[in-house]
Curated annotation (Swiss-Prot):
It holds the Pfam family A_deaminase. This is Adenosine deaminase. Its EC number is 3.5.4.4. Keywords: Hydrolase, Metal-binding, Nucleotide metabolism, Zinc. Substrate binds at residues 21, 23, 181. The record marks 232 as: Important for catalytic activity. The gene is add. It catalyses: adenosine + H2O + H(+) = inosine + NH4(+); 2'-deoxyadenosine + H2O + H(+) = 2'-deoxyinosine + NH4(+). The keyword Hydrolase applies. Binds 1 zinc ion per subunit. One of its GO terms (biological process) is purine ribonucleoside monophosphate biosynthetic process. The active site is at residue 211.
């Protein structure tokens, strides 16, 4: 009988990550180091452990708005080419060390121009850092493919410019577009021009929707904006009636989301921190998985949530009793939903993900 997944063995499993914010995944030591180099004096702590603890504690706020406040510090130390390159390089290293074989990492270029960099400078530097990180990881025997999503802040008015940026860099490592930030009062339909531009150029995009706000945000993202994926989308559970015996009935919105196989970029630990759910055990991930939605496992912000893909998977295993076949399905779901070309997705699934999961399950295909 195949042994149940443990944290130690999960660390060996290949992973595909679709929802990870570059400015939410810095190493605490890097934040301190760059802050010293650039003269940023507003950090809440000057010790690595104390700073890591502050980010973690501050992010357990119970609201999305308060959860986003610590980003002012990470963004402040990501304003120079040297800092952006380093953060991107280390991001690739950290993900590869956790056996992530494919990642789409997102960031908002508009947050990194306060020291005079242009949008193109920012994106080019980050992509260069990712490429160098990929090369270093391959040399260390931990190959990873890292691609980029450029994000527009939903409370600002730069989404069309950022969409154009995505198209300019589409053959250089940017595979899609996103909008992020506080949902309440900032519906995705305010950015229709950007989404139409992406569709006009046959490009892919995801939308943060259904995280802190409810079904209207999801409906707009799908029906009016045409999102290829949903960032979080956890509130779709509000359109599912669950019986006392565990049976369920999908509402119209939930049904179309499932029927169209629109991927959900679920981030369990982050959802607990922002108050979207009370605990991992109460997270609707398992309900959505049993209902055969295309669920994927993601980190969101590794620094703020003090997490990794392995930890996210292990927490789900502990909460819902998942086995290797479940983790393999969630991983294949993510790889199927990636924004790279079909043949590249298939190659990673068939040549990397399936064989390595088969080995972990004690048999070969």
């Amino acid at each position: 009988m195949t042994a149940a997944p443990t944290l130690q063995t999960i660390r060996l499993a290949p992973k595909a990550l679709l929802h990870d914010h570059l400015d939410g995944g810095l190493r605490p030591a890097t934040v301190l180091d760059i802050a010293g180099q650039v003269g940023y004096d507003d950090l809440p702590a000057t010790d690595v452990d104390a700073l890591a603890s502050w980010f973690r504690t501050q992010s357990h706020s119970g609201s999305l708005e308060r959860y986003l406040e610590p980003f002012s510090h990470t963004v402040a130390v990501m304003q120079t080419p040297e800092a952006l390159y380093r953060v991107a390089f280390e991001c690739a290293q950290d993900l590869a060390a956790d056996s992530v074989v494919y990642a789409e990492v997102r960031f908002a270029p508009e947050l990194h121009i306060s020291c005079g960099l242009s949008f193109d400078d920012v994106v080019d530097t980050v992509l260069t850092g990712f490429a160098a990180g990929e090369k270093a990881c391959a040399a260390d025997g931990q190959p990873i493919t890292v691609r980029c999503l450029v994000t527009a802040m939903r409370h600002a008015a730069m989404s069309r410019e950022i969409a154009e940026l995505a198209i300019r860099f589409r053959d250089k490592g940017v595979v899609g577009f996103d909008i992020a930030g506080a949902e309440a009062g900032h519906p995705p339909t305010r950015h229709l021009d950007a989404f139409e531009y992406m569709r006009d150029h046959n490009a892919r995009f995801t939308i943060h929707a259904g995280e802190a706000f409810g079904l209207p945000s999801i409906h707009e993202a799908i029906a009016f904006c045409g999102a290829d994926r949903l960032g979080h989308g956890v509130r779709i559970v509000d359109d599912i009636d669950v019986d006392a015996d565990g049976g369920f009935q999908l509402g119209r919105l939930a049904a179309i989301l499932r029927d169209k196989r629109i991927p959900l970029e679920l981030c369990p630990s982050s959802n607990v921190q922002t108050g979207a759910v009370a605990s991992i055990a109460e997270h609707p991930f398992d309900l959505l998985a049993r209902a055969r939605f295309r669920v994927t496992v993601n980190t969101d912000n590794r620094l703020m949530s003090d997490t990794s893909m392995s930890l996210e998977m292990h927490r789900l295993v502990e909460a819902f009793g998942y086995g290797w076949s479940d983790l393999a399905r969630f991983t294949v779901n993510a790889m199927k939903s990636a924004f790279i070309p079909f043949d590249q997705r298939l190659a990673i699934i068939d040549e990397v993900i399936k064989p390595r999961f088969a080995a972990l399950m004690g048999h070969s295909e």
